Each structure stands twice: as structure tokens, then as C-alpha cells.
């Protein structure tokens, strides 16, 4: 039996804790196993809280509180989205 391929891990960073909480709730409602956590040291964020998730990122989720979205690739992070409203 083949095991399913692992989900891609994304990290979303935010300007505010409220933004992180709102994004987390949105992903949970979509069925993702999203987790709020401290931002990894390699990344920087205004509020220090990020959301780790596995669904493919949809640009429609972006609002003024979203700072950036990264794809976690082995030992590094690749920028997928950066909010131009910052």
C-alpha cells in the first residue's frame, strides 16, 4: 500500500495577532489542520505569530493583516506571496 504524498507545509506571517487568529480560523473552517505558532527564526514578522498550514495558498485569502506566505522546502523557505499593502 502506498502512503499518500506529504502535504506541502506553508507558513503565513502577519502584522497582527488578530490577523493570525482570523486566518487560522478560516483555514480550520476549510478543513485544514492549521496550527498557530511562533514565527521560525529564518523569517521575520511584525507580530511574531504565524500559521502553519498545508492547503495550497489562495490569494483570495490575503487581507491587510497578512504579511507573507512561504513554502517550507527542506531546510529553507521560498516566498510565495508578499502583501504589497504593507
Give the label of every model feature segment.
Residues 7-8, 66:
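A structure-centric signal for secondary-structure junctions around beta-strands
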Residues 8-11, 17, 21, 25-60:
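Amphipathic, hydrophobic secondary-structure cores in small proteins
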Amino acid at each position: 500500500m502506498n502512503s499518500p504524498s506529504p502535504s506541502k507545509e506553508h507558513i503565513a506571517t502577519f502584522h497582527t495577532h488578530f490577523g493570525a487568529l482570523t486566518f487560522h480560523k478560516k483555514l480550520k473552517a476549510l478543513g485544514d489542520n492549521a496550527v498557530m505558532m511562533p514565527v521560525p527564526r529564518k523569517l521575520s514578522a511584525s507580530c511574531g505569530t504565524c500559521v502553519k498550514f498545508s492547503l495550497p495558498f489562495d490569494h483570495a485569502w490575503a487581507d491587510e493583516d497578512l504579511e507573507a506566505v512561504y513554502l517550507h522546502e527542506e531546510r529553507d523557505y521560498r516566498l510565495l506571496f508578499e502583501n504589497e499593502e504593507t
